A protein has these predicted regions:
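Stable alpha-helical elements in mature extracytoplasmic
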Residues: 1, 15, 85-95, 137-141
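Structured beta-strand-rich core segments of catalytic domains in phosphoester-bond hydrolases
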Residues: 1-67, 202
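Sec-exported extracytoplasmic/periplasmic mature domains
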Residues: 2-6, 21-24, 97-101, 146-150
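His/acidic metal-ligating clusters that form di-metal
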Residues: 45, 52, 81-114
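A structural motif
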Residues: 46-72, 111-120, 150, 154
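A solvent-exposed, charged loop/short amphipathic helix patch at secondary-structure junctions
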Residues: 63-83, 125
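A short acidic, glycine-rich active-site loop
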Residues: 76-86, 130-136
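Metal-dependent phosphoester-hydrolase catalytic domains
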Residues: 98-108, 116-234
Length: 234
């Protein structure tokens, strides 16, 4: 695919890869601290400006579709902490610390399948919408990203989750026996003084179905939707 488009390509692992229309000038892996199955990245040259781009995958369990929204906030968070996502994101943020210190001169974009909701979506305003079951939840992974200085590009550009929740998962709910939430678990975060999101949209589709994009029909190859964010470098 990369060769046919004339793109640069980095295979981080059999789970993660990065395609870039801009030259890749450096690759990053932190295998001693976090598996390349979960995280890795590159530095690209955007018309003479370096940008660090990272791809992320956090574990899919516990399954967000089964979040016990009828329980208390404390019980929901205890359920979430039974998995490894919180541990994984803190390992990732730990290895990124030297690069985060340079983010104002070399901006960072960090995207991927985080397999967990965002506290920016599970608010007082949405508690009785989207099958949230009355729950308002400070999901730990998105809180950790925010505390590390990252901005959620989609929610920054679409600040009202009531008007635009942004769905990247579970378009296939009709195939399930019980009603399931369709929610946002894929994100593009960014950080740095010289980068600014100027547009962001979530596109929702299902594996194997036809997807129409920019007037063309495509076979859709993923069980997730995707986020498309546009950035301006200053």
């Amino acid at each position: 695919v990369a060769d046919s488009l004339g793109y640069s390509y980095n295979l981080i692992s059999d789970n993660l890869s990065i395609y870039s229309r801009y030259p890749i000038i450096r690759k990053y892996a932190f295998a001693d601290s976090i598996s390349t199955f979960n995280f890795g990245g590159v530095m690209i040259d955007v018309d003479g400006k370096p940008v660090r781009v990272f791809n992320t995958w956090l574990h899919y369990l516990p399954d967000m579709r089964l979040a016990p929204t009828d329980k208390s906030k404390e019980e929901i968070l205890a359920w979430e902490m039974e998995g490894t996502r919180d541990e994984e994101i803190h390992k990732i943020l730990s290895v990124l610390q030297p690069l985060l210190a340079e983010a104002d001169s070399i901006p960072i974009i960090m995207g991927g399948d985080f397999n967990v909701h965002s506290h920016l979506d599970w608010t007082e305003a949405t508690r009785n919408l989207y099958l949230h079951g009355g729950a308002v939840v400070d999901w730990p992974v998105s809180i950790a990203m925010e505390e590390a200085g990252f901005k959620d590009s989609f929610r920054e550009m679409n600040p009202n989750p009531v008007a635009n929740l942004g769905v990247t998962w579970l378009t296939d709910a009709d195939s399930l026996e019980t009603e399931c939430r369709m929610d946002r678990i894929d994100f593009i975060y960014y950080q740095g003084k010289t980068i600014q999101a100027i547009a962001s949209e979530c596109y929702d589709n299902s594996l194997g179905k036809t997807f129409t994009f920019k007037g063309e029909d495509f076979f859709y190859p993923s069980d997730h939707g995707f986020v498309l964010s546009k950035f301006e470098l200053k």
